[in-house]
Amino acid sequence: MDAAAREMKSDEAYKEQFIQDYLFASGVADGALKAATKENDKKLLKVAKDNIDAFFINSGVATCDNLQAIYAPKVEQNKTNLDYLKQVISVMQMLNCTEQEAYFAASEAAHAIEPTAETAVGCGYMYYKKGDMDKCIDYFDQAINLEQDQLKKADYAYKTAAILFSKKQLSKAKQYALKAISLDGNNGKPYILIANMYASSPNWSDEAALNKCTYFAVIDKLQKAKSVDPSVAEEANKLISTYAAHTPKDADLFFLSLKKGDSVTIGGWIGETTTIR
C-alpha cells in the first residue's frame, strides 16, 4: 500500500486504484485473521489489519467528497455490476459517507438486482433526504425484515425510530424504539430516544402540574437506559439532571391531592404510569 500511496501522490487519477489496493490488502488481512488458530498470530494479524485501516483512513483519499467524486460516474457505468456496487456501498459505509449521492445510487441499483438489508437502508436514507417519508420507512421496514442478525435488526429499528422522531411522528417513532428494545434489550439508546420523545411533547392535560409529571416518565426511561447499558450512563445522567428541573413542586401537586409515592398515568400518546418523587 505504501507503493500505491506514492503512485497516488504523483497521479491524482490513481485514487480509485489506491482504494482497490486497500480493499485487497484489507481482505487478505481479514482472511488470515479468520484462519489463524494461535493467539499470538491473531494478535499480530490484528495489529497488521489495524495498521492497514489507519494508513487508508489517514491517506487523504478517505474523505466523503473524494469518494463521491470517484464513485459517482463509476456507479452510473456499473449499474448492473453487483460486485462493484457492493464494493462501493461497503467502502462508503465503512467511512460513514452514507449521505453522498454515489452511496444512494449504488444502493438503489444494487437493491434492484439483489435486495439486502444494507441496500434497503441506503435507499431508505436516500428517500429521507428527498423528503419522501413513506418510501423511506418502507425501505427501512424491508431492511428489518431482510436482516438475519438480531442486533442489526435492532439497530435498523432504532434508526427508523430516530428518523420518525426527527419528523415529529412521535407515536410511530416510539413503536420502532420499542421494537429495537425487544430485539436488543441491552442497548440503552432506544430508551434515551423514548425519553427525549416524551420530553419533546410533555403536555397532555389542562393541569400544568400534571404535564410536568411527564418528566417523571422521562426519568424512568433514562434510569432504565443506564441500568441495561452502562455505556450510556454518562449521557443518561446528564439528561436526568436536566429534566429533573422540570418536574412539579410539592406545592403544585398538593392542590391535585397528589404527593410523593403516588402513581400518575401520563395520558395522550405516551400512555405510561409513573411514580411521583
Where are these regions (language model features)?
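"A position-specific structural signal for the A-helix of alpha-solenoid helical repeats
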Residues: Q87, G122, Y158-K159, L193, ...
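Preference for long, solvent-exposed alpha-helical segments and helix-linker "stalks"
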Residues: M1-F104, I113-E114, E234-Y243, S257-R277
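Residue-level recognition of tetratricopeptide repeat
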Residues: N81, T116, Q150-K153, N186-N187, ...
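Canonical positions in the second alpha-helix
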Residues: A109-A110, A143-L146, K179-A180, A225
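Short coil/turn linking the two alpha-helices of tandem helical-hairpin repeats
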Residues: A5-K9, Q93-C97, K129-G131, Q148-L151, ...
